Amino acid sequence: MTTAAAFDRGASRYDLLVGLNPGYHRELRVAAEALVDRVGHRPGLRLIDLACGTGASTRALQRAAPLGTEVLGLDASHGMLEQAGRASWPMTVRFCQAVAGELDVAALGPGSHHGIMTAYLYRNVPVQLRDKAVAEVYELLAPGGWLVVQEYSVAGDSRARVVWDAVARFIIIPLGVLLDGNHDLYHYLWQSVVEFDSVTRFADRLVAGGFEDVAHRTATGWQHGILHTFVARKPREKS
């Protein structure tokens, strides 16, 4: 089963399960506000929510952005997009199916977006395509545009690994089985975090991809040291 197919299967119960995490929506708001604060509260903004899932991150971005901001939600999973489409959205928000690492940058508009937010995407991108996926968002951003990435990472942090393993094995996977019957998806989510880049390694990917002003912070609460928010800027054009 592909990753997209696994998310298709779990789409109908996904919001219920992630909503049981008390910090989930708060951290999405933090990421969305971090992006909008950096691109500026101004008319005519064009933003992308890459790996928008069921639209929770899109909603956070839409609420943080000025009225009239264009927000494009992209996701590989048809099932997730179907769930997102059931909600009520302003005319300036739309959704489209697309796969990170295989984006049609020319069709999406290279250099035409002021900001891109992506939550829980990069660990789902095959390692051999990760740098390409970073390059795609770089190409989509306008000069001076900002990228905000929210992602789990425990590599190189033994305390974070112990906490994550315990939460995944004794809470996430059992709840996933109980509420959704989808053991494979939640076991995959556990392992995808374990196998993902360290914080330093991912930050280095962003720098290698041409980004500057790369910084990161970790979440509060039980996710401290596990969930991280990265910010990075595409250089402005030299005058």
Task: Walk through the language-model features, giving the residues of each.
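Conserved class I S-adenosyl-L-methionine
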Residues: M1-H41, A56, A60
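Class I SAM-dependent methyltransferase SAM/SAH-binding core
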Residues: R46-D104
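A short acidic, Gly/Pro-enriched loop at the edge of an enzyme's catalytic core
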Residues: G101-I116
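A short SAM/SAH-binding and catalytic strip from SAM-dependent methyltransferases
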Residues: H114-L129
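A short glycine-rich, Lys/Arg-flanked "PGG" loop and its adjoining helix->strand segment in the class I
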Residues: D131-P143
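Conserved beta-strand signature within the Rossmann-like core of class I S-adenosyl-L-methionine
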Residues: G144-E151
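C-terminal alpha-helical "lid/dimerization" subdomain adjacent to the S-adenosyl-L-methionine
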Residues: Y152-R205
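Core SAM-dependent methyltransferase catalytic element
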Residues: G209-E212, T218-S239
